From Swiss-Prot:
PROSITE patterns: EF_TS_1, EF_TS_2. InterPro entries: EF-Ts_dimer_sf, Transl_elong_EFTs/EF1B, Transl_elong_EFTs/EF1B_dimer, Transl_elong_Ts_CS, UBA-like_sf. Associates with the EF-Tu.GDP complex and induces the exchange of GDP to GTP. It remains bound to the aminoacyl-tRNA.EF-Tu.GTP complex up to the GTP hydrolysis stage on the ribosome. It is found in: Cytoplasm. This is Elongation factor Ts. Keywords: Cytoplasm, Elongation factor, Protein biosynthesis. GO terms for molecular function: translation elongation factor activity. Residues 80-83 are annotated as: Involved in Mg(2+) ion dislocation from EF-Tu. PANTHER family: ELONGATION FACTOR TS, ELONGATION FACTOR TS, MITOCHONDRIAL. Belongs to the EF-Ts family. HAMAP family: EF_Ts (MF_00050). CDD domains: UBA_EF-Ts (cd14275). Disulfide bonds: none annotated.
Amino acid sequence: MSDFSMETLKTLRQQTGVGLTKCKEALEACGGNLEEAVVYLRKLGLASAGKKEHRETKEGIIAAKTDANGTALIEVNVETDFVANNAVFREFVSNLLNDILKYKVDTVEALSQAASSQDPSLSVDELRAVTMQTVGENIRISRVAYFPKATNSTVGIYSHGNGKTVALTMLSGSSTADSLAKDIAMHVVAAQPQFLSKESVPAEAIAKEKEVIASQIQGKPQEVIEKIVTGKLNTFFQEACLLEQPFIKNADLSIQSLIDDFSKTSGSSVAIEQFILWKIGA
């Protein structure tokens, strides 16, 4: 046996998160030198990561976080739900959010090249490789977003299904509308709107919807067809547009009415500037 103690073996395992067998192999290869063993394991991780890159990654988590300057959003995928709930993997994702907020990056490439806050001696992509060795699965950073914080604004975050679906809402007109912003984010996850408002629906989407409706009511007088099309189009807007949808917590209120009521009560002029809905693999 090489000249290293159980305490050194334990320290190496704690520092790297790698299994005892690999840690022992590293210490034996490096003559018991802890620092060299860490480097050995990192190189081993980078090498073994390449062998896993081709594996499918259909599971994972979506996570979001805000600070005083902005909001970070990320999707990271792995092979199995078991690893998606692994503490090491979740810590890795949590630190990725910190990196996005620190560097204000909004692409996978920019994030991957940045120095990791979890281990500044490694880039994010190098740490991804080391983490792949630890959890034994391919890890893929699928998408990244960063939203700078606007003046007098509030961001709401709602996560569902242990990170399988996440919604963000950006409200203008108030910096203290946290409860409202989170309620609307929760509503977005439940109702899954396609558009913010009627005005934001593309003309081609409206034209396509009219074609579908018209094909269902052929043979009726033109004035009747026009009334039916108008009615069905309004139903389409109520289903597809966030501001038109009935609030999930109180169907008597539309989301627009909910915002109007808050604005009157708070004396502010609140509006939804943007909403984002991410689902794993979508």
